[in-house]
UniProtKB/Swiss-Prot annotation:
Modified residue annotations for Phosphothreonine: T10, T16, T91, T150, T165, T250, T258, T282, T298, T375
Origin species: Mumps virus genotype N (strain L-Zagreb vaccine)
TM segment ranges: none
Alphabetical keyword list: Coiled coil, Phosphoprotein, Viral RNA replication, Virion
Subunit structure: Homotetramer. Interacts (via multimerization domain) with polymerase L; this interaction forms the polymerase L-P complex. Interacts (via N-terminus) with N0 (via Ncore); this interaction allows P to chaperon N0 to avoid N polymerization before encapsidation. Interacts (via C-terminus) with N-RNA template; this interaction positions the polymerase on the template for both transcription and replication. Interacts with host RPS6KB1 kinase; this interaction may play a role in the viral replication and transcription.
Sequence segments annotated as region (Disordered): 54-98, 145-186
Name under which the protein is recorded: Phosphoprotein
Biased composition (Polar residues): 54-65
Function: Essential cofactor of the RNA polymerase L that plays a central role in the transcription and replication by forming the polymerase complex with RNA polymerase L and recruiting L to the genomic N-RNA template for RNA synthesis. Also plays a central role in the encapsidation of nascent RNA chains by forming the encapsidation complex with the nucleocapsid protein N (N-P complex). Acts as a chaperone for newly synthesized free N protein, so-called N0, allowing encapsidation of nascent RNA chains during replication.
Free-text note on domains in this protein's UniProt record: The N-terminus consists of a long intrinsically disordered tail. The central part contains the coiled-coil multimerization domain (MD or OD). Forms a four-stranded coiled coil structure. The C-terminus constitutes the alpha-helical X domain (XD) that binds to the nucleocapsid (N-RNA complex) and the L polymerase.
UniProt subcellular location: Virion
The keyword Coiled coil belongs to this UniProt entry's keyword annotation: yes
InterPro entries linked: P/V_Pprotein_paramyxoviral (IPR004897)
Family, as annotated: Belongs to the rubulavirus/avulavirus P protein family.
Length: 391
């Protein structure tokens, strides 16, 4: 199904709606059953019997009555009005105004006793007539009388306009008032009838001179603003550089923390090594200690058990100090020192000279000393001097 309506179909729908509205507006409005039961003033009900509007009451058709008569009683019923009580006499009313209807849409025909004269007051009848007319005219459009609009003229309204009176429109019922259509009498502000002021012919003209220029002050202010702007940009650049170094500062802090942790670990390991190898506090070489624990001759004087003495060497000898010994000690032979490989150390010292010595003359002197060095002590002296020179 197409959800969009074409323009031609829209125009046909609008035209059909306008025709229906015009049909209902042009049809006459019947004033039957205009007043409800609560709107009738007590004492006036008997005089409202026999209203000519009963002619306009349309009785329902047979089909309509059949649809409504299911489960109900049909139709039209007659009611006879009883005579009024004594003491309610008044002026006779020539004609009644309304017919009465029953409840639930059932039309009730009212018959009047010919012996009964309608009673009531003219004031009540007039009020009922006014209410009837207002209820009927409420739904009928009437041409409104337009209020004459006063044309505004400078100097106040004319004599003809002053004599006119403004007629206010009433609401004539319960409808809303459209308001007054009078235009405002003043079109030039709050002062309604202000007289024009005539120019003064004998006035003295004022002397007019050239206003001094202030371009110099403006230039000075602009130069000052430009200087402040330049300084502000310079400060912003410096702040940007400082903020850019923030990551580098954080990295340096992290590396410093790592170095501190490593240094603490090395110090702990060095303390452990010192505890495990406390060194030689006496300063006695190990060879001498071993020599003191070697075998030697023991002289026992006096009687005693000599079974522990060895029988293999019964001969005693005297040493160079005339001390008795079982066997003379052989002459001590010095062991030849092993020749150490100094080539690796020389290569290391050469690299130290190249990296740590910046002065060419000092570098040449260290190279000459390294070429002449042939012992480990000489190489250690050269290395020590290189470190001192670098510091």
């Amino acid at each position: 199904m197409d959800q969009f309506i074409k323009q031609d179909e829209t125009g046909d729908l609008i035209e059909t709606g306008m025709n229906v509205a015009n049909h209902f507006l042009s049809a006459p409005i019947q004033g039957t059953n205009s007043l409800s039961k609560a709107s009738i003033i007590p004492g006036v009900a008997p005089v409202l019997i026999g209203n000519p509007e009963q002619k306009n009451i349309q009785h329902p058709t047979a089909s309509h009555q059949g649809s409504k008569s299911k489960g109900r009683g049909s139709g039209v019923r007659s009611i006879t009005v009883p005579p009024p009580e004594a003491g309610n006499g008044g002026t006779q009313i020539p004609e009644p105004l309304f017919a009465q209807t029953g409840q639930g849409g059932i039309v009730t025909t009212v018959h009047q006793d010919p012996t009964i004269q309608p009673t009531g007051s003219y004031r009540s009848v007039e009020l009922a007539k006014i209410g009837k007319e207002r209820m009927i005219n409420r739904f009928v459009e009437k041409p409104r009388t337009s209020t004459p609009v006063t044309e505004f003229k400078r100097g106040g309204p004319g004599a003809a306009a002053q004599g006119q009176t403004i007629q206010e429109e009433g609401i004539d019922g319960n409808g809303a008032s459209a308001g007054s259509k009078e235009r405002s009498g003043s079109l030039s502000g709050a002062t309604l009838y202000a007289h024009l002021s005539l120019p003064q012919q004998d006035s003295t003209p004022a002397n007019v001179g050239i206003a001094p220029q202030s371009a110099t002050s403006a230039n000075e202010i602009m130069d000052l603003l430009r200087g402040m702007d330049a300084r502000l940009q310079h400060l912003e650049q410096k702040v940007d550089k400082v903020l850019a170094q923030g990551s580098m500062v954080t990295q340096i802090k992290n590396e410093l923390s790592t170095v501190k942790t490593t240094l603490a670990t090395i110090e702990g390991m060095m303390a452990t090594v010192k505890i495990m190898d406390p060194g030689n506090p006496t300063g006695v070489p190990v060879d001498e200690l071993r020599r003191s624990f070697s075998d030697h001759v023991t002289i026992v004087s006096g009687p005693g058990d000599v079974s522990f003495s060895s029988s293999e060497e019964p001969t005693l000898y005297l040493d160079e100090l005339a001390r008795p010994v079982s066997k003379p000690r052989p002459a001590k032979q010095t062991k030849p020192q092993p020749v150490k490989d100094l080539a690796g150390r020389k290569v290391m010292i050469t690299k130290m000279i190249t990296d740590c010595v910046a002065n060419p003359q000092m570098k040449q002197a260290f190279e000459q000393r390294l070429a002449k060095a042939s012992t480990e002590d000489a190489l250690n002296d050269i290395k020590r001097d290189i470190i001192r020179n670098a510091i």
